[in-house]
Every structure is written in C-alpha cells, then in structure tokens.
UniProtKB/Swiss-Prot annotation:
SUPFAM superfamilies: Class II aaRS and biotin synthetases, Nucleic acid-binding proteins. HAMAP family: Asn_tRNA_synth. GO terms for molecular function: asparagine-tRNA ligase activity; ATP binding; nucleic acid binding. The gene is asnS. It comes from Nostoc sp. (strain PCC 7120 / SAG 25.82 / UTEX 2576). This is Asparagine--tRNA ligase. It catalyses: tRNA(Asn) + L-asparagine + ATP = L-asparaginyl-tRNA(Asn) + AMP + diphosphate + H(+). Gene3D superfamilies: Bira Bifunctional Protein, Domain 2, Nucleic acid-binding proteins.
Length: 463
C-alpha cells in the first residue's frame, strides 16, 4: 500500500484507494459497534477521519489505546463520507499504535489552550492547530524567499555565525569564548588575555551578515544571506528575541531606488506565495487570530508602496491630530507609534521612508550631498511598523573612513571592509528583514515567541 500525506489525501484522494496513513490522534469518538478517530500528520490543518469497525482484530484493545496524542499507522481504503464536514474518510483494515499518550498526563486535550500555557510546553505545542499553521506558513515564507532570489539570479551565501565585527555598532553582543570562566587569564592591566582564547581575539555571535555579504557582492554582484543572528538585548517584550533569522540581500551596481524596488517586490512575492500555498492556514488565522490578516495581505500585494523622505514624514507627524507618547522632532528616530501612524492611519498601506539623519544611522550608509542625511530606507507596514531596513552603502573610501572615525570605531578593525573601497569599488545597496517579524505580520500572531519553534529570550533557553 502507498503511504500518503493527509494534505494530499484531503485534496485529491478518491474512494476505493488503498493506502497507509501515519500520524497522531487528535480526537476519538466511540459509538455502538465502531469508533471514529481524527488523525493529523502535520501536513495540513485538516484531519483525516478514520472509521474503525468492531470486527477489526483486537478492536477493544486498540481503541482503548487511541487517546489524543497517540501515534498510529492505519492501513485502509478511502470511502465517501456519510457525515458532514469531510468529503472522504478512511475505513481501517489494520491499525498499529506506535506510542500511547496517557490522557491523565498528556497536556494537550480537546480544548483551546492559551498561548501562554503552550509556551510552557514548547516541545508539544507544534501539535496544536495554531502552531501547526504558524510553522507551515513559516516554511512557505522560507521557500518564497529562496524562490524570489534564485529566480533573479542571486547567489545564496553563508556568512559566519562567529564574528569579530559588530555590524550595527550597538554593542549588544553575545561573546564566544573557550576560556575557563573560573580562571580567566588576565593581562598586566587586568584585562582579559584574549591571546589565550581559541581565536586569540574577542569574538561574538553575529548580529548581521551584511558586511560579509558585501564582500561576496563585490565578486558575484547579487547575493543574499538567510540565517540566524543574535542580539544580547535584555528586552522581555512581545517584539524581541535573542536569536532570530535575518534575510539580507546585497546588490552591486545598485542605488537606493533599486533597493526600494527590490524590497517592495520581495514582500509582495512572499505574501502571494503564502496565500497560494497555505490558503487553509491563512483562513484559520483570519478566523481565530486576527480577522484582518487576509485584508492586510491583499493590501500589501495590490498597493504600490508610498515613498517619502524622513523630513517629509516628520512634517506629517508634526501636523498629525494625534497625541504621541514619544516626541517628534527632526533628528530623532521614528518610534513604532510614529511608523504605525504613517502606515495604518495616514496612508493605509506600506510606506518607505528615506534619507534619515546621518547621526541616527549606521556608519556604512551612503552620506548624501548635504552631509546631514544618509541614503537609508525603512519599509513601514500597517500593524507592525518597520519590517525592512536598508540603505545604499558608502562606496567612497575617504567618506567611509571619516564615518568610521566619527562613530568611535577603529579603521584597523575594518581593514578588510575598507579594502573593498580600495579595489574596484562600486555603488551598492542592500537591506535586512527580520524573518520572525515577517511571519508575525503575515499570521497576525501577537507575540514573536510564537512564530519560532524554540524562542530564545532573557532568562529562557529551553531545549
């Protein structure tokens, strides 16, 4: 017999097909002479109903084992369903129970559990409808990212997890060391003697693959990274993770206009792909989590993003008939409430803000001719605020050296990055997208800890 995934069976299975299904029991109902179980294998939101007649060998023993959470293999034949709610069902000819789940102790029963409770059983929460849908959408987003860039001739490059550089200059880094923490070697002035460490210098978990991606773009023109990044930011909020995934394309011979065009096309592609591949899951989110997710997706796909400068954005915010918690003034960074006002209330669609003050942006962003602003851009989305941050990079060696020094960094630490401007420099641009924030935005999930399988947050590193 053919082993089939339940998603495929529900989509195209026909009566009289003989097949094998493997999965986990979601529910059981016993009636006189037979039992119904609903089996799910993670491939779809929907379950496959299995009918077990009492003439099955060891019927009573098997049915007693088929509690919620038990793992099973069912051999049988598809038949047209007599009941409502499903087109077909599986008439069991043989049932094998791989593993039982004691109903007295198994924490997932047939009721809705709060997300707070499910975070306490992270090893089991993927078996619920909500988290099954989240991680199928997360998978579809991942596939869409690779599809988008590969179709456009980008090279996927693997940038290092362990690095000696702080791309953002924020200092919120996790240190990597093999030194004995009980007996840390010291220099004469009582600093840490890194010469005895594994890499003979201070090293950290990466906060971004951007600088290394720029290296590769100077050889392959268009590249992208997609991998984990780390921030030792002690923020216990619904928007922050210590370990999260980033998508970072870099394009040689590209300016800010090209960067914005790519970012807009990129977001539209991902939303289109998810709606095509996960319609059932997206409908679930729209009904159970946030009744605007489908409308939001259509908004992203069907609207041209609004583009305006930071200076114009500040003027609009100053005129707004809204009392903001944080001040609005030229030279201050936009807060989430400002970003959401622009995207949600004013323009009612995604907004790209460009040309931010140089003093609030990173050293590598291209200085504008006025020397007050840089060629930066942020994509602001309704309901979430900033979803993408990017810029045209500074390709002029003398200007970049000035910017490095102005931000208190040492040029010798970035000698290799400066070399890119010495040998065959070109205008280039790129952006970064926080993957979990994207999944959160698409699904409507309220807490970022619920869109990654194993969240890493302050005081929490389970599994």
């Amino acid at each position: 017999m053919v082993n089939r995934r339940i998603a495929e069976i529900l989509r195209s299975g026909q009566p009289d097909e003989s097949l094998v299904v493997q999965g986990w029991v979601r529910t059981k109902r016993e009636l006189k002479g037979f039992a119904f179980i609903e089996v799910n294998d993670g491939s779809s939101l929907g379950n496959l109903q299995v009918v077990i007649n009492q003439d099955l060998p060891d019927y009573a023993v098997i049915v007693k084992q088929l509690n919620t959470g038990a793992s099973v293999e069912v051999n049988g034949v598809l038949v047209a369903s007599q009941g409502k709610g499903q087109r077909i069902e599986l008439k069991a000819e043989a049932v094998k129970v791989y593993g039982e789940a004691d109903p007295e102790t198994y924490p997932l029963q047939k009721k809705r559990h709060s997300f707070e409770f499910l975070r306490t059983i992270g090893h089991l929460r993927s078996r619920t409808n909500s988290f099954g849908a989240v991680f199928r959408v997360r998978n579809a987003c991942s596939a869409a990212i690779h599809q988008f860039f590969q179709e456009r001739g980008f090279l996927w490059v693997h940038t290092p997890i362990i690095t000696a550089s702080d791309c953002e200059g924020a200092g919120e880094l996790f240190s990597v060391t093999s030194l004995d923490l009980k007996q840390i070697p010291r220099t004469e002035n009582q600093g840490i003697d890194y010469s005895q460490d594994f890499f003979a210098k201070p090293t950290y978990l990466t906060v971004s693959g951007q600088l290394e991606a720029e290296v590769m773009a100077m050889a392959f023109s268009n590249v992208y990274t997609f991998g984990p990044t780390f921030r030792a930011e002690n923020s216990n909020t619904s928007r922050h993770l210590a370990e999260f995934w980033m998508v970072e394309p870099e394009m040689a011979f590209c300016d800010l206009e090209g960067d914005m065009d790519l970012a807009e096309a990129f977001l539209k592609h991902i939303f289109n792909h998810v709606l095509e591949k996960c319609p059932e899951d997206m409908e679930f989110f729209n009904q159970r989590i946030d009744n605007t997710v489908l409308a939001t997706a259509e908004n992203i796909i069907n609207n041209q993003f609004e583009r305006l400068t930071y200076t114009d954005a500040i003027k609009l915010l100053e005129k707004a008939d809204v009392k903001f918690e944080y001040p609005v003034s030229w030279g201050l960074d936009l807060q989430s409430e400002h970003e959401r006002y622009l995207a949600e209330q004013l323009f009612k669609k995604p907004v790209i803000v460009t040309d931010y003050p140089a003093q609030i942006k990173a050293f590598y962003m291209r200085l504008s001719d006025d020397e007050k602003t840089v060629r930066a851009m942020d994509v602001l989305a309704p309901k979430i605020g900033e979803i993408i941050g990017g810029s045209q990079r500074e390709e002029r060696l003398d200007v970049l050296e000035r910017r490095v020094l102005a931000q208190g960094m040492q040029p010798e630490d970035l000698w290799w990055y400066l070399d890119l401007r010495r040998y065959g420099t070109v205008p280039h641009a790129g952006f970064g997208l926080g993957f979990e924030r994207l999944v959160q935005f698409i699904t409507g999930m309220g807490n970022i800890r619920d869109v990654i399988p194993f969240p890493r947050t302050p005081q929490n590193a389970e599994f």
